[in-house]
């Protein structure tokens, strides 16, 4: 009887195309993680959208504070608050860039995994075994 990591052999002694234990494990793991990765991706996308909106609101508020400061007859110093808002905006932009880079890496990784999975399936379906595989 064939082990979990070896290919099956027909009665004539020729290898029978079929997934190895390692391939089955990899595919199962991929299917197990796919919903979590997709959920994470959608959450990152939502956070990025909200950060863009937050950045726009900070810009609007800073502009409005500057306008109020210029229009005031009483000397009210709003500059420190404007600086704090601009500093917060800078941090929001920084976090957004980090999220964007992480999301792009996740997208590339997901693409690579899907490509490798398709390649392995094609090899298994055609009966071609990679060098060093137990079915050779």
From Swiss-Prot:
Modification sites for N-acetylalanine: 2
Residues modified to Phosphoserine: 10, 50, 126, 133
Subcellular location: Membrane; Cytoplasm, Cytosol; Cytoplasm, Perinuclear region; Golgi apparatus membrane
Coiled coil ranges: 37-126
GO BP annotation list: anterograde axonal transport; anterograde synaptic vesicle transport; autophagosome maturation; endosome to lysosome transport; intracellular protein transport; late endosome to lysosome transport; lysosomal lumen acidification; lysosome localization
Molecular-function GO term, any one: SNARE binding
Keyword Metal-binding belongs to the record: no
Residues where Phosphotyrosine is found: 129
Post-translational modification: Phosphorylated by CSNK1D/CK1. Phosphorylated by PKD, phosphorylation controls SNAPIN protein stability.
GO CC field: acrosomal vesicle; axon cytoplasm; BLOC-1 complex; BORC complex; cytoplasmic side of lysosomal membrane; cytosol; Golgi membrane; manchette
Organ and tissue specificity: Expressed in male germ cells of adult testis (at protein level).
Residue positions where Phosphothreonine is found in the record: 14
Keywords, ordered alphabetically: Acetylation, Coiled coil, Cytoplasm, Cytoplasmic vesicle, Exocytosis, Golgi apparatus, Host-virus interaction, Lysosome, Membrane, Phosphoprotein, Synapse
Subunit structure as annotated in this protein's UniProt entry: Component of the biogenesis of lysosome-related organelles complex 1 (BLOC-1) composed of BLOC1S1, BLOC1S2, BLOC1S3, BLOC1S4, BLOC1S5, BLOC1S6, DTNBP1/BLOC1S7 and SNAPIN/BLOC1S8. Octamer composed of one copy each BLOC1S1, BLOC1S2, BLOC1S3, BLOC1S4, BLOC1S5, BLOC1S6, DTNBP1/BLOC1S7 and SNAPIN/BLOC1S8. The BLOC-1 complex associates with the AP-3 protein complex and membrane protein cargos. Component of the BLOC-one-related complex (BORC) which is composed of BLOC1S1, BLOC1S2, BORCS5, BORCS6, BORCS7, BORCS8, KXD1 and SNAPIN. Associates with the SNARE complex. (Microbial infection) Interacts with human cytomegalovirus/HHV-5 protein UL70.
Functional summary from the UniProt entry: Component of the BLOC-1 complex, a complex that is required for normal biogenesis of lysosome-related organelles (LRO), such as platelet dense granules and melanosomes. In concert with the AP-3 complex, the BLOC-1 complex is required to target membrane protein cargos into vesicles assembled at cell bodies for delivery into neurites and nerve terminals. The BLOC-1 complex, in association with SNARE proteins, is also proposed to be involved in neurite extension. Plays a role in intracellular vesicle trafficking and synaptic vesicle recycling.
Family: Belongs to the SNAPIN family.
PANTHER family, per database record: SNARE-ASSOCIATED PROTEIN SNAPIN
Protein name (Swiss-Prot/TrEMBL): SNARE-associated protein Snapin
């Amino acid at each position: 009887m064939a082990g979990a990591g070896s290919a099956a052999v027909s009665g004539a002694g020729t290898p029978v195309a079929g997934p190895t234990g390692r391939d089955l494990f990899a595919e199962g793991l991929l299917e197990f993680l796919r919903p979590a990765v997709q959920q994470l991706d959608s959450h990152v996308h939502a956070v990025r959208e909200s950060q863009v909106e937050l950045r726009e609101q900070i810009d609007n508020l800073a502009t409005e504070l500057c306008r109020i400061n210029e229009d005031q007859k009483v000397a009210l110093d709003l500059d420190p608050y404007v600086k704090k808002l601009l500093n917060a905006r800078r941090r929001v932009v920084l976090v957004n860039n980090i999220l964007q880079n992480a999301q792009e890496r996740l997208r590339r990784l997901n693409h690579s995994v899907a490509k490798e999975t398709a390649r392995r399936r094609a090899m298994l379906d055609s009966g071609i075994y990679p060098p060093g595989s137990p079915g050779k």
